[in-house]
């Protein structure tokens, strides 16, 4: 008989993980068809990320990208002279990212694993998340914050984009409560956040900027969708 006794907090987290849709096979299937009409499949960086670099809000140094997917932001950062480590649990996404990096002749340390299994020796000057947070279930949110705090240097910056609550775009995330996730055992495509909730979640960080992402009409050399938040925080 399978032993399903819960002994530790980690056992509880893994049990809750198992009751939600498995993330790895979903994202492998998602990235397997590279011809799909998905805006962020284009090999272009987020407009807010470009603004951080151009305005020198973030100085060159060591960068960790969480949920890098096919690598578009990691490649941009490497091209700008950053030392980039990029993590994603999808083998399909990482393979695509490696091919793109090779084509662009940039060096990036790619890691194919869950961000919650990450074990690296470095501390980072900048951590970036483009669309990972809103796919993380509430019971893992504290682990996510702990991960950022562990790997981000004091005075370092953390940037993200995520679904914005209140936007009616059909591609936006769901506005269910944290409890509702477990009533229905689903994130319903991803969780939308209000500005107030972002400020509360990251209350231990200094808020540098929270704004809607600028809509970038394609074709373009930057990605931008106005149903997303962009945020930049500084570790105190």
Give the predicted meaning of each segment.
Residues 131-135:
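Short catalytic micro-motifs in class I SAM-dependent methyltransferases
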Residues 1-120, 136-147, 151, 157-236:
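Class I (Rossmann-like) S-adenosyl-L-methionine-dependent methyltransferase catalytic domain
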């Amino acid at each position: 008989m399978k032993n399903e006794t819960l002994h530790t907090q980690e056992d509880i987290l893994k049990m809750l993980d198992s009751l939600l849709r498995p993330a790895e096979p979903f994202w492998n299937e998602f990235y397997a068809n590279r011809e799909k009409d998905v805006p962020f499949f284009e090999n272009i960086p987020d407009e807010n990320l470009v603004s951080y670099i151009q305005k020198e809000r973030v100085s060159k140094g060591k960068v960790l990208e969480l949920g890098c997917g096919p690598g578009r932001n990691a490649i941009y950062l490497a091209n700008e002279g950053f030392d980039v480590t990029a993590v994603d649990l999808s083998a399909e996404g990482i393979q695509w990212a490696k091919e793109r990096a090779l084509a662009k002749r940039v060096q990036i340390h790619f890691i194919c694993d869950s961000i919650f299994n990450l074990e690296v020796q470095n501390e980072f000057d900048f951590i970036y998340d483009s669309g990972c947070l809103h796919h993380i279930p509430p019971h893992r949110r504290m682990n996510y914050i702990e991960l950022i705090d562990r790997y981000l240097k004091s005075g370092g910056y953390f940037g993200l984009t995520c679904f914005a609550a209140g936007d009616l775009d059909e591609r936006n995330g769901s506005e269910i409560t944290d409890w509702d996730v477990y009533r229905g055992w689903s994130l319903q495509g991803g969780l939308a956040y209000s500005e107030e909730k972002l400020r509360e979640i990251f209350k231990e960080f200094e808020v540098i900027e929270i704004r809607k992402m600028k809509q970038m009409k394609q074709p373009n050399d930057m990605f931008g969708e106005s149903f997303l938040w962009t945020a930049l925080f500084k570790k105190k």
